[in-house]
Curated annotation (Swiss-Prot):
Subcellular location: Cytoplasm
SUPFAM superfamilies in the record: Phosphoenolpyruvate/pyruvate domain
Protein's name in the database: 3-methyl-2-oxobutanoate hydroxymethyltransferase
Residues annotated for 3-methyl-2-oxobutanoate binding in this entry: D49, S50, D88, K118
Pathway: Cofactor biosynthesis; (R)-pantothenate biosynthesis; (R)-pantoate from 3-methyl-2-oxobutanoate: step 1/2
Cofactor descriptive note: Binds 1 Mg(2+) ion per subunit.
GO cellular component: cytoplasm
EC annotation from Swiss-Prot or TrEMBL: 2.1.2.11
Binding sites annotated in the UniProt record for Mg(2+): D49, D88, E120
GO BP, one annotated term: pantothenate biosynthetic process
Length: 278
């Protein structure tokens, strides 16, 4: 009798070797049920620090903690079997120095079982990326618009104009040279993101960047139409689940108030209309 084997996860090495004719499909995931639904369709699931805004209603990602990332990372790992799972390193968990970054990254990897971590930053973070990679922790880079630096950016705005274009390019090249297996490019002018993609030896993953990127990522709640407070231009909604959820809640509330739910078929031992026990 054969015993079914669990699906093998996509590895960071496999993602690094992806060619332009096989784009990387990535979405964020924060919970086990959503991870389970997305798993078969995604190469990469990112447990993003965007959960602070999407799940917890925070105004920015800055208050997110390592403990929060670990709890959601565990949930996504339990809910998925196939996709490579990356966990964001939150603000303040890696910027101090390489050793702080290693302690927190190692803890995230050990306690979640995820395949890699993602951190924001450019050339100033290259030594940190190298430090982690040399110690066996795969790293995704993140350049362009960096949400953890939202105050320094002057808000959530597209980057890559004028001298910024050269800086974003230099940042991406430094992170790739340091050993990142892929680099996320966020909120960057399309020609700049395209040029970076063509210049790097590793795949890029775009979000509000360019169709030329080696892959694309979006926040799953945006894709599903669940998060309506703010919709960036680069978001495409593939479903509108928000109104469906509201309709279901309204129908439930109506039946409870009308005392039509629960009905006999939803109860145990309650006589049916014909008098027989249910």
């Amino acid at each position: 009798m054969s015993v079914p084997t669990a699906a093998k996860r996509i590895t960071t090495r496999q993602l690094r070797m992806r060619t332009p004719d096989e784009p990387i499909v990535a979405l964020t995931a924060y919970t086990a049920p959503i991870a389970g639904l997305l798993d078969a369709h995604c190469d990469l699931l990112l447990v993003g620090d965007s959960l602070g805004m999407v799940i917890y209603g925070m105004e920015t990602t800055l208050p997110v903690t390592v403990d929060m990332m670990i709890q959601h990372g565990r949930a996504v790992m339990r809910g998925s079997q196939r996709a490579c799972v990356a966990v964001d390193m939150p603000f303040g968990s890696y910027q101090e120095d390489e050793r702080q970054a290693y302690r927190n990254a190692a803890r995230i990897m050990a306690e979640t079982g995820a395949s890699c971590v993602k951190l924001e930053g450019g050339a100033e973070m290259a030594s940190t990326v190298a430090f982690l990679v040399e110690r066996g922790i795969p790293v995704m880079g993140h350049v362009g618009l960096k949400p953890q630096s939202v105050h320094g950016h002057g808000g959530f705005r597209t980057v890559g104009r004028g001298a910024e274009a050269e800086q974003v390019m230099a940042d991406a090249q430094a992170i790739a040279a340091a050993g990142a297996f892929t680099v996320v490019i966020e909120g960057t002018l399309e020609p700049v993101a395209r040029a970076i993609t063509e210049a790097l030896p590793v795949p890029t993953i775009g979000i509000g960047a360019s169709p030329a990127c080696g892959g694309q990522i979006l926040v799953s709640d945006d894709v599903l139409g669940l998060f309506s407070d703010f919709t960036p231009r680069f978001v495409k909604r593939y479903a509108q689940l928000g109104p469906i959820i509201e309709q279901a809640a309204a129908a439930y509330a109506s039946e409870v108030r009308a005392r039509t739910f629960p009905a006999p078929e939803h109860c145990t031992g309650m006589p049916a209309p014909d008098g027989r026990p249910a």
